[in-house]
Amino acid sequence: MLSILLAALWVAPGNGPAAAAEAVPADLSEADRADLARIEAYLNDLTTMESRFLQFSEEGVAEGRIMLDRPGHLRIEYAPPVPVLMIASSRLLMYHDTQLKQTTFLPVSETPAALLIDDDIMFSGDVTVTAFERTPKAFRITLEQTDAPDTGSVTLMFEDAPMRLAKWRVIDAQGTAVDVSLLEPRFGVEFKNAGDLFSTIDPNSVIE
């Protein structure tokens, strides 16, 4: 379960076989590069977002709510019966099983949460664009970790005119696919209790 849910974000390094080579970059035209720069600018201009989501995987369908407060914060709440809460705050990603009362921490840099919450989002450096597709009203960008392409890939799908992130697909090192679709996203929302919403303090350590 943990690997499937983390795959909704990315594949953490070390989950698959050691990579033998770097990711192979896509052959991009000047128009492609211009569109990628526009998408980077869109992501960097995002401040806050709240959305319902649907997740499809070999384990079935899950749903929940995602909250983004850039830079630095992301919260993913799964609806019952999935007893999971994930919060990314600056350098840590917290995975909390609300049923088992177990908490796991990972560096944000080892998850794709960094793609959404970094101060400066770039489709280069640690990640490589390995495929780029354009249709009249949408874009699909496939990314792999530059130094570890065998750990999997993520494909981000954007609607255009107006630009918005619509869904993503993650394929892990074993070829397992996880699809996440955003439903009725709202942008520029105000989180009045942001300090609590995006806290990565282990819930097990809170004294009631």
Which positions does each model-derived feature cover?
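Extreme N-terminal tail/first-helix region
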Residues: 23-43
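An acidic-aromatic
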Residues: 65-115, 178-179
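A short, Trp-centered hydrophobic/proline-enriched beta-strand micro-motif
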Residues: 41-58
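Boundary at the C-terminal end of the N-terminal hydrophobic targeting segment
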Residues: 7, 18-23
